[in-house]
From Swiss-Prot:
Chain residues that bind ATP: 623
Chief localisation class: cytoplasm
InterPro entries noted in UniProt: aa-tRNA-synth_I_CS, aa-tRNA-synth_Ia, Leu-tRNA-ligase, Leu_tRNA-synth_edit, M/V/L/I-tRNA-synth_anticd-bd, Methionyl/Leucyl_tRNA_Synth, Rossmann-like_a/b/a_fold, tRNAsynth_Ia_anticodon-bd
Catalytic activity, as annotated: tRNA(Leu) + L-leucine + ATP = L-leucyl-tRNA(Leu) + AMP + diphosphate
Organism listed in the record: Marinobacter nauticus (strain ATCC 700491 / DSM 11845 / VT8) (Marinobacter aquaeolei)
HAMAP family named among the record's database cross-references: Leu_tRNA_synth_B
Protein's name in the database: Leucine--tRNA ligase
Amino acid sequence: MDEQYNPREVEQTARTFWETNETFKVKEEPGKPKYYCLSMFPYPSGKLHMGHVRNYTIGDVISRYQRMQGKNVMQPMGWDAFGLPAENAAIANKSAPAKWTRSNIDYMKNQLKQLGFGYDWSRELATCDPEYYRWEQWFFARLYEKGLVYKKMSTVNWDPVDQTVLANEQVVDGRGWRSGALVEQKKIPQWFIRITDYAEELLNDLEDMEGWPEQVKTMQRNWIGKSVGTELTFPLKEQEGGLTVYTTRPDTLMGVSYMAVAAEHPLAKAAAERHRDVAEFVDQCRNSKVAEAELATMEKKGIDTGFKAIHPLTQEEIPVWVANFVLMDYGTGALMAVPGHDERDHEFAVKYKLPIKQVIAPNDSRDIDIQEQAFTEKGVLVSSGKYSGLTSEEAFEEIADYLEAQGIGKRTVNYRLRDWGVSRQRYWGAPIPMMTLEDGTEMPVPDDQLPVRLPEDVEMDGVQSPIKADPEWCKTEYNGQPATLETDTFDTFMESSWYYARFCSPNYDKGMLDPAAANYWLPVDQYIGGIEHAILHLLYARFFHKLLRDVGLVNSSEPFKRLLTQGMVLAETYYRNEANGGKTWYNPADVTVERDGKGQVVRAVLKSDGEPVEIGGVTKMSKSKNNGIDPQAIIDQHGADTVRLFMMFAAPPEQSLEWSDSGVEGAHRFLKRLWRMVNEHTAGGDAPAVDPANLNGAQKDLRRKTHETIAKVSDDISRRLTFNTAIAAVMELLNEVGRLSDDEPQSRAVRQEALDTAVLVLSPIVPHICHNLWQALGHSDAVVDASWPVADESAMVRSEIEVVLQVNGKVRAKENVPADIGKADLEKLALENENVMRFTDGKTVRKVIVVPGKLVNVVAN
């Protein structure tokens, strides 16, 4: 082997071997235990960032470890290729999104190969490939036939100048990103999938998902948002019908002091026709789209409609207001306001001087002032007529019973979850496979006409979707009759909701999935990705899996057995304040820093002009702060194994990882040291086999350390997924190897065993260098095909142990003794120890406390 570690050559050798031997290509082997490891596939944005590298390194380490356990391991990779950024890039570069996307895929695929990830590239898929989305279109038609798809009017961002629909991210400060026009809220017909039909199952199945982080399950529970309450109707004064509301707190019914309706509610529209100020307010609400997440923090505004509702228990008249915090899409678009016992209702009541009544008192003797602050806990009813004195729980039941008996209310279960709107008015997505006949009938495109292909050779004008702008594209026919194709495309979450299943049979052309392959590989054993996908992607994928099950394509009910959500990659930020009040951010690679003794940056200057820059602190790597580190630059400088080792060593996978140049250099030094140790060892020729019966103390110590390391690393990687502590254990082992430097045959034997072990257990983490070192250590097989080492229990048994000797609780000596020494012998040894005798001389020994295997404490006075 070469004396010097040359990452470029070493890594090329390993990659050539894997590619030539198709090492990672797998097929179903029914008799062999399978392991399907999947990292969330990337959007082909142009080049990999460090977040990708961290995610995919974790996945590759787990995959290679499982392979060494003798499992049939599948680790595929593909591209989540549709989406808005491709359209924006195409407009900027005056090219077609397909061309930009495919060129990015080529570049990023090469980067993934350079990092040595063990992917089965024969399974590669891109979601923009018609052979992929044709099956999504086929599946949508099946869902339509099952009644799980419907169309309804839904609100979009409308640019009145460009006459086009804008995505939320194309609305900047309420204006269209290109035209600058004030964006309006407009209702258009859109397609929805009934995820709410599966709400209960999606919620209940979380209970059995032991391999998922509790945090993610909680986020999904909250998103599904199951609640039990009462739906009741307040009659309207001098109006037909009534106001139906849903409440989880019927116990607070006597505290209602106003009603609030959404701007789109029929009652708000009726009031707008009568009062100009109401009409203006309703228009204002309609054009300022509010995301549900913003409701809590935004300013609450409203206006009195002039209508009155009648309280169902007291017959009191209650004013009906239009309020900007009530959404038509949630519940009934109306709510009963109880300002004494709800913070939002309280804030609104204070602002508009509406009555605030107390109807719940604390269970204890606390003093509360309901005018100052809402009391939102449950308690005991007060000022509630015949219900006063009941607990909130008792009143819930009694009031619900009364409303049901009177026919004005009923107990209901409600979900926060809304049906999934899958229509997008964008071009770069999979066309929705629906068509409209001349008589207005809507139906799925017949299977024999799929895929509905997206034309790829297009020009983007930045305004209209090319398929909406081309009147010819949407022309088709059905049974000889003219028909018109839908020009909306699918939400890109559709593609990522089933890609994991298509990887099982990516080239299967007889159906969406090959059931035999799907049921062999699924569910995914380990899924890895960022926690930002906890709700939408992971919930949609769970939903899709149940749909796949219900059309008979898979047997299982959940897609992912274990989920690991890796932490973010952070880096220092540097900037200068500009005259206009903005900031210019500088990349860490362009800045020279000085650090204090603790490694904190204390001064930073820009390399180009030598002038100081401000230190902005450590934050997530991002384009906006320009603090991303290009993985390619680090690979070119130090090699892929160094990047992989740093990523795995710097932090446990779930925690944030702070980028550190010195940490990267430390990882590189460790690999050079490992190379040098193997080189020095192999220069002495072949080592004999270990003869456990003929080892001296130092040789036994190294052998014990080797097998303790195997036990620790196995547990760290398989159960705990703490790769950083596994690497630290190997570093300790190599320190021990360095201490046993003599050339006795059995010293060489235990050293060979230790180095073999280090290379084996590091091979999932730094596979290129280990591929070369394994062969240098004299093995004819490849390390990627080797089995994971097994700890030898007998090697870990200590023949000698160190015992601490104390007098009156203070350490006075340490002795090496046989591991099986008895209590009496230990006591004798302690009392005869020179140092112990020095501290007991002239004193009476009162008692001797022996803790076997640990210490002896002599009590004397």
